[in-house]
């Protein structure tokens, strides 16, 4: 079964019939569920901390939220990587798109699925907590919009670079088995680094769900522009400067395992 992921270095729009291909539909459903799993646990950890403590701006609270994000993303990537590639993030999908690893048609379907998954998870979280309003993301005092854009771009560059190295690179070898942990742990580390400044979004879907359900839109554009810039640059750098030209057209890890591999 093909997931429709293409060799790199060739931007492709894709065919209209790709949107209704069973493999594409399965991949989009996988992205929806994986993103919902991630956002529910990630935003839930923030709500839980706020429920227990009046002041969440403590070092212990930051570590707890970072760990929750790391574990949630690791699981979300693991459950989706053999079906859709385990993007779980519109910025990661964009990085794969500019590197020629997914078609535009598939990318658009992934984006829709990821955003819907994030909204569904946040709605379920609000219902399950008796109507608690998701806090979402905000810039700390003294942090300007463009400072946050730069921070988001740098953090998401690292996230996308790690994804390329452990999931997409044709020569990733056995390192591919730790891809979910590698990506998850880096996300957690970035939450520790950037959380006190802008919440450390790195994922437009992760930010969009709470923004819509909690109706908090201030500085929202920052959490789209920064991650897309960082992920797009990482995709170009890894695709053109790291992967040898001879390996660029080699199919990669977004193929499901054969039954005997389970």
UniProtKB/Swiss-Prot annotation:
A Gene Ontology biological process in which this protein takes part is: water transport
Q: Which UniProt keywords apply?
A: Membrane, Repeat, Transmembrane, Transmembrane helix, Transport, Vacuole
Compartments reported by the entry: Vacuole membrane
Instruction: Note the topology in the membrane.
Output: Multi-pass membrane protein
One Pfam family cited in the UniProt record for this chain:
MIP
At which positions is motif NPA 1?
89-91
UniProt motif (NPA 2) ranges? 203-205
Primary subcellular site in the record, as a coarse category: membrane
UniProt entry tagged with the keyword Plastid: no
Q: Where are the transmembrane segments?
A: 27-47, 61-81, 104-124, 148-168, 175-195, 223-243
The source's domain of life comes to: Eukaryota
Q: Which GO terms describe its cellular component?
A: membrane; protein storage vacuole membrane
Q: Name one GO molecular function term.
A: water channel activity
**Which SUPFAM superfamilies is this protein grouped with?**
Aquaporin-like (SSF81338)
Stored PROSITE patterns: MIP
InterPro entries, alphabetically? Aquaporin-like, Aquaporin_transptr, MIP, MIP_CS
Q: What does this protein do?
A: Aquaporins facilitate the transport of water and small neutral solutes across cell membranes.
What is said about the domains? Aquaporins contain two tandem repeats each containing three membrane-spanning domains and a pore-forming loop with the signature motif Asn-Pro-Ala (NPA).
**Family (UniProt):** Belongs to the MIP/aquaporin (TC 1.A.8) family. TIP (TC 1.A.8.10) subfamily.
Put simply, this protein is called: Aquaporin TIP3-1
Q: Which organism is it from?
A: Zea mays
Q: Per UniProt, what is the name of the gene that codes for the protein in this document?
A: TIP3-1
């Amino acid at each position: 079964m093909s997931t429709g992921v293409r060799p790199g270095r060739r931007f492709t729009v894709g065919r209209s019939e790709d949107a209704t291909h069973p493999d594409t539909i399965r991949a989009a459903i996988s992205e929806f569920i994986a993103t919902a799993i991630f956002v529910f646990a990630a935003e839930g950890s923030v709500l839980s901390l706020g429920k227990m403590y009046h002041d969440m701006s403590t070092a212990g609270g930051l570590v707890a939220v970072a760990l929750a994000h790391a574990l949630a993303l690791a699981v979300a990537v693991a459950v989706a990587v053999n079906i859709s590639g385990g993007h779980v993030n519109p910025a990661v999908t964009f990085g794969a798109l500019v590197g020629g690893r997914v078609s535009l048609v598939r990318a658009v379907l992934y984006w829709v699925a990821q955003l819907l998954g994030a909204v569904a998870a946040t709605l379920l979280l609000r219902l399950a907590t008796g109507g608690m309003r998701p806090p979402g993301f905000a810039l700390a005092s003294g942090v300007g919009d463009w400072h946050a854009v730069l921070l988001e771009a740098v953090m998401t560059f690292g996230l996308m670079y790690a994804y390329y190295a452990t999931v997409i690179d044709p020569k990733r070898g056995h390192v591919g088995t730790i891809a979910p942990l590698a990506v998850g742990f880096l996300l957690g580390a970035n939450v520790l680094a950037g959380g006190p400044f802008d919440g450390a979004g790195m994922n437009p879907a992760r930010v969009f769900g709470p923004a819509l359900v909690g109706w908090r839109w201030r500085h929202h554009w920052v959490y789209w522009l920064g991650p897309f810039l960082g992920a797009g640059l990482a995709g170009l750098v890894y695709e053109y400067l790291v992967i040898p030209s001879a390996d660029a057209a080699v199919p990669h890890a977004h193929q499901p395992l054969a039954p005997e591999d389970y």
